[in-house]
Amino acid sequence: MSNNFKDDFEKNRQSIDTNSHQDHTEDVEKDQSELEHQDTIENTEQQFPPRNAQRRKRRRDLATNHNKQVHNESQTSEDNVQNEAGTIDDRQVESSHSTESQEPSHQDSTPQHEEGYYNKNAFAMDKSHPEPIEDNDKHETIKEAENNTEHSTVSDKSEAEQSQQPKPYFATGANQANTSKDKHDDVTVKQDKDESKDHHSGKKGAAIGAGTAGVAGAAGAMGVSKAKKHSNDAQNKSNSGKVNNSTEDKASEDKSKEHHNGKKGAAIGAGTAGLAGGAASNSASAASKPHASNNASQNNDEHDHHDRDKERKKGGMAKVLLPLIAAVLIIGALAIFGGMALNNHNNGTKENKIANTNKNNADESKDKDTSKDASKDKSKSTDSDKSKDDQDKATKDESDNDQNNANQANNQAQNNQNQQQANQNQQQQQQRQGGGQRHTVNGQENLYRIAIQYYGSGSPENVEKIRRANGLSGNNIRNGQQIVIP
């Protein structure tokens, strides 16, 4: 017993199982307890592998669980195919020859040998993987489990051979042809159904089809999967998962090639030939006539399948074209209704424009009439105002003329009065002077000339005399004025 902490820690680590693997937890725990017990006893001198090995092992276990689910689904389809193959073998004519009891066992030993070969190859691939080996005792335990599995498989197969051994039946060529033809028709119908399911379900359908084709060659192996479920350990589960993965990948690649190349009929014929060969290998006499009838029926089925594909394509084109035509018709109707609506809208807008223009013209004519009436009224008012102003002016002129006439009359009367007053003053002055001469001013006479006329000299003294005599202060005298000359 080692005291290394790392060894104890790694030994106590447990793998993580998924929920779908809970039904086998008891078997796994028993196997793990046995392996741990052996590890603690015999692994004391061995270098323990690194931690990454445990992680890789857990990944393989998870992949094994996932592949086991797919394998279980394919196993159910295998059982159904085996049951159908058993019914076909009962109807087939093979018991007339002496080698009937030997050939089925030889045939059934072939799948056993192939299965052991797959398990051994998978185990060898796992051993050749660059991952470190955990311990030698674990591999020894795995080998022992494989041997037990092989022995249990052999026993189960022998029982299945005895149960499925065909009954003695005398066959003719016609019976063999009819039997193989019926069998071929059944297999063709089933493969058509399987192919349609594979086309719609993807990888799951491809795995089921691959399992069906693989089991068709080994129609007598009834109890293989049940023995594997209860006796194989984790290594056998991983190996079977790898084998199933390889078959699934191969089947999926074949399906993809068939789907892209349009050769589904050939694939159906190949699967039918494999199934018929696996079911008819129990007899050595059915080698020539059944194969010929199978080939003829296979060709007919291929032609029928191609015709069905053409009909499907035509139906698919019709399904594609009908919605397109309906969409085009709907769009055309919408376009027509839209054009009519736009046309009506345009007509309505034109009518509205015409009505608006007519209304605007009527409004403009009304405005013009009102403006003309206003201008007439204004001209009339201006004319009346002018005439009134003229009348006022005329009356004013008349009043001014009357007033001027009155003023002139007053002025004339005042002038007359002044003249009379001046005459009176002059008379009074003449009376005061007495006998002096009087001179009436005429034309342009002045005091200087009057002094020269009367005194012979126009000296200032003479002029001053005349002034004093007449009471003048200046030289201004007027026409018609009488001057006293002293």
Swiss-Prot record:
Stretches of the chain found on the membrane's Extracellular side: 2-204, 341-486
Region (Disordered): 1-314, 351-440
Keyword set, alphabetical order: Cell membrane, Membrane, Transmembrane, Transmembrane helix
Residues in LysM domain copies: 437-485
Domain of life: Bacteria
Polar residues: bias regions: 64-85, 233-246
NCBIfam families: elast_bind_EbpS (NF033598)
Note on domains (UniProt): The elastin-binding domain is located between residues 13-33 at the surface-exposed N-terminus, whereas the C-terminus, containing the LysM peptidoglycan-binding domain, is not exposed on the surface of intact cells and presumably remains buried within the peptidoglycan. The presence of the TNSHQD sequence, corresponding to residues 18-23, is essential for EbpS activity but not sufficient, additional flanking amino acids in the amino- or carboxy-terminal are required for elastin recognition.
Protein name: Elastin-binding protein EbpS
Native species: Staphylococcus aureus
Gene name of the record: ebpS
